[in-house]
């Protein structure tokens, strides 16, 4: 497709507020609230088949509407236990998301289907098919999918940065996430839901043998629900499966020159 056919648009409204307070020299807190709305649309016309001087075109239109509400609160305290300094961070998050997604297949006026065949030319002419008949493509007639999703995530996290000495820092922490999702297939009249409770640990070690040299190692885990990042669908098979868990291990050396 051309630049007028293959398009991507994004409209977003974001409102964010943050409140910070210093309780003492060793204690501070922060509360953040964000509300956003966005509309995103992908539309593409692409080659799905090729045979000599003929090319078969297919396409889709994929609009998404999403509303998010984020709430985050955390408290940071510095505590000394003898010669060891602890920087303890605790917090909570709440995320609510309403998502609507639609998927349209292309509809060609000559075939009444999502595909049409054209003669290869430069530039391509998509107004006349390979049989010489005038044709027109529509991106909003043939709906393939329509879904709405409701997502709620509640999280609690804690991290302790332990300054054992001037050249040794240890970090330990983790977070607990409760993830609830319900996906309604408007076109099929069905719905699927799932709830996941996951604990994700993290830890790290930084050793500084010299002022300009740091040796570090870290380990962390994260997870991705079976609904994916776009929350478009959750079939019966995916609803019965545990989320994907990712492990990340990093070891390195940092030199300040």
Question: What is the predicted role of each segment?
Answer:
Residues 1-10, 38-52, 179-181, 186:
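Periplasmic-side early beta-strands and strand-to-turn transitions of outer-membrane beta-barrels
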Residues 1, 45-54, 104-115, 186-195, ...:
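Flexible, surface-exposed loop regions and adjacent strand-edge segments
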Residues 18-34, 38-44, 211-216, 242-257:
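Membrane-embedded beta-barrel scaffold of Gram-negative outer-membrane proteins
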Residues 52-58, 134-137, 216, 228-230:
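Generic detector of short, locally flexible boundary/turn motifs and exposed helical patches
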Residues 66, 85-89, 93-97, 147-257:
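Structural signature of Gram-negative outer-membrane beta-barrels, strongest in the C-terminal barrel
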Residues 2-3, 16-19, 52, 91, ...:
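Glycine-centered flexibility motif
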Residues 1-16, 56-72, 147-148, 186-195, ...:
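Outer-membrane beta-barrel proteins
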């Amino acid at each position: 497709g051309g630049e007028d056919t293959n398009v991507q648009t994004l409209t977003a409204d974001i409102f964010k507020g943050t409140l910070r307070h210093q309780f003492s020299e060793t204690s501070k807190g922060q509360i953040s609230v964000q509300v956003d709305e966005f509309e995103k649309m992908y539309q593409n016309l692409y080659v799905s088949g090729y045979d000599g001087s003929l090319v078969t075109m297919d396409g889709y239109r994929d609009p998404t509407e999403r509303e998010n509400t984020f709430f985050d609160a955390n408290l940071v305290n510095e505590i000394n236990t003898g010669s060891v300094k602890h920087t303890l961070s605790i917090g909570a998050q709440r995320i609510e998301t309403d998502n609507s997604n639609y998927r349209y297949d292309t509809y060609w006026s000559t075939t009444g289907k999502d595909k049409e065949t054209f003669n290869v030319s430069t530039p391509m002419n998509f107004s006349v098919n390979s049989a010489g008949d005038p044709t027109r493509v529509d991106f909003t007639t043939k709906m393939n999918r329509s879904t709405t999703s409701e997502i709620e995530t509640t999280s609690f996290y804690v991290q302790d940065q332990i300054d054992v000495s001037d050249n040794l820092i240890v970090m330990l922490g983790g977070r607990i996430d409760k993830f609830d999702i319900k996906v309604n297939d408007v076109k099929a009249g069905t719905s699927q839901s799932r709830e996941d409770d996951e604990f994700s640990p993290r830890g790290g070690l930084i050793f500084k043998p010299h002022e300009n040299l740091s040796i570090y190692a870290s380990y962390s885990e994260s997870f991705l629900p079976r609904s994916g990042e776009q929350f478009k669908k959750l079939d019966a098979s995916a609803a019965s499966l545990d989320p994907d868990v990712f492990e990340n291990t990093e070891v390195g050396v940092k030199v300040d020159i």
